[in-house]
Amino acid sequence: MVAIFLKTKTRMNINPIFSRFVAVENIDLKNKDEVVSWSKEEISFDDTKNYKSTGTNHLNRDEPILKELVDKIELGFNNLHNQIGLSSEHKQIVSSLWVNDGSNNTAIEAPHRHVDGIFSAVYWPIADNGCAPLTFMNPNNQMSYVFKSKLIEVHNQFNSDMVNLQPQINQCVYFPSWLWHYVSHVLSKTNN
């Protein structure tokens, strides 16, 4: 067998397959300051014995102060649901929610996923350059064995084994719940 390689000046069309995604939008809340204050109280009041090792206490989605936020995230979930071609016979709802700050929380520091959902979202009502990034891990765990760092000139969706997303004020990030992710507070310079 003989392989012939031709050098061409035209660019190939590269089509990703088995796509993963993150969707990003800004959410402006009329009651953002109240949500932030209420969230800080929830963190300090949390009565879960092992708060730091098990994650945060799940919040009541029907809490009146959270209504606008829950409604907007559900709208985002359903827009995403429609855009990726899921059945119009089904709707997405927020089934659980919790609040984190920039402090040490081993539950979000370890790579994890949310196996009970289809989509997950992270909303930052406050953020600054000191916030730790949200890190997503490529589900193709062979990536780092194939593309050694010395081979990569520009990191992109085809050659990266992880992606860091820097939080922005009012930003909401939607992603598939099966996508492994974490927040390394070692990288954080603030508690936002």
PLM regions and their residue ranges:
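Non-heme Fe(II)/2-oxoglutarate
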Residues: 6-90, 100, 108, 133
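Short beta-strand His + acidic residue motifs that chelate non-heme Fe in jelly-roll/DSBH
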Residues: 109-112, 181-188
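Catalytic core of non-heme Fe(II) oxygenases with the double-stranded beta-helix
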Residues: 99-174
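Exposed beta-sheet edge/beta-hairpin loop segments within beta-rich domains
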Residues: 163-166, 185-189
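Short Gly/Ser/Thr- and Asp/Glu-enriched loop/turn motifs at secondary-structure junctions
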Residues: 92-95
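Acidic, Ala/Val/Gly-enriched low-complexity intrinsically disordered segments
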Residues: 2-3
